[in-house]
Amino acid sequence: MPERIHRREFLKTVGPAALVGSELVRGAHSSTSTSTATSEPGTNRNARLLTGCCAYSYSKLLKAGKMTMEDVIRKAVELGVAAVDMTAYWFKSTEPAYLASLRHLAYKDGVCFSGAAIGTSTVQADASKRAQVLEEIRKWIDVTEALGAPHLRVFAGKLPDGATMQQGIKWTVDTLKVACEYSGKKGITLGVENHEGITQNAEVCLELVHRIASPYFGINLDITNFIAIPQADAYAQIEATLPFATHAHIRDVFENGQAVDLDRVWPLFARASYRGFMSAEYEGEEDPSTGVPKLVEKIKTLCRKYSSV
């Protein structure tokens, strides 16, 4: 993924509104989740934590032309995962025949597509550029439908020079609200990722959810992407946004090199009664051929430990 903005730069940009305190975390969780299950291994039968894999995990090999999207589907069989999140960057085309071939290959191999993922930036000061972004999202909603996938990951992006956080949020709300009206007619959910830019803070993600107010919108939750602040570390921000998670991307190392406490993360998903995919998104230094299986095995073990499946 692209290099992040520095924490100080981010906080300077968003100002006081970025301070996600414990009250927000508790309020967001308690207002949407009614589960009383504990986080003890194997006790939460409401959560359905399913192991998946992002095509992005093989980005090094895909960029080098050593793998294709067809190979990613075949890798899913080797890994024993239920689904693949199809990152759009390496599609040969968006022609119907190509998309149909991917869908058919996945069906024959017993693999489903948990979703598709595109790179977008809705924080455009120019209205004509925002219109172009909306059309691009609509295009990929159609692609997602052709694949038979239920979910499309989008980005909000970084603020342009001179723009305020509230402007960026408004531009994103205006664009994604219309996009959700389109995707909803096809039964496709849009998930904005807490990725580089305005959505690296839980409060902004929650504001987007509440202002867009669509059953076809939520948060594509990457557990390593939130910028920790004194009032809320990454784990607190994960918990705050979990009730609205549409898909989860899993890495085991934060950007600063610190290991993620996965045994702390999984109970949060269990208590929130999350039902969906925990998709490996490997970005380590090790070759993906050996690094991805190791991450997938960690995810499988934890899904069995904290889920009914």
Feature map (PLM): residue ranges:
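Active-site acidic/histidine proton-transfer and metal-coordination neighborhood
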Residues: 14-24, 38-46, 103-118, 122-219, ...
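Short strand->helix junction
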Residues: 91-92, 123, 255, 285
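Histidine-acidic metal/acid-base catalytic patches
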Residues: 2-80, 199-309
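Short active-site-proximal "capping" loops at secondary-structure junctions
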Residues: 58, 89-93, 121
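Charged helix-capping and loop-helix junction motifs
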Residues: 67-69, 98-101, 130-137, 166-176, ...
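Glycine-rich, proline-tolerant flexible connector loops at the mouths of alpha/beta enzymes
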Residues: 85-103, 159-162
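Conserved beta-strand positions in the central sheet of alpha/beta enzyme cores
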Residues: 85, 115-117, 153, 249, ...
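Short glycine-centered, acidic/aromatic-flanked micro-motifs in structured strand/loop junctions
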Residues: 88, 120, 156, 192-194, ...
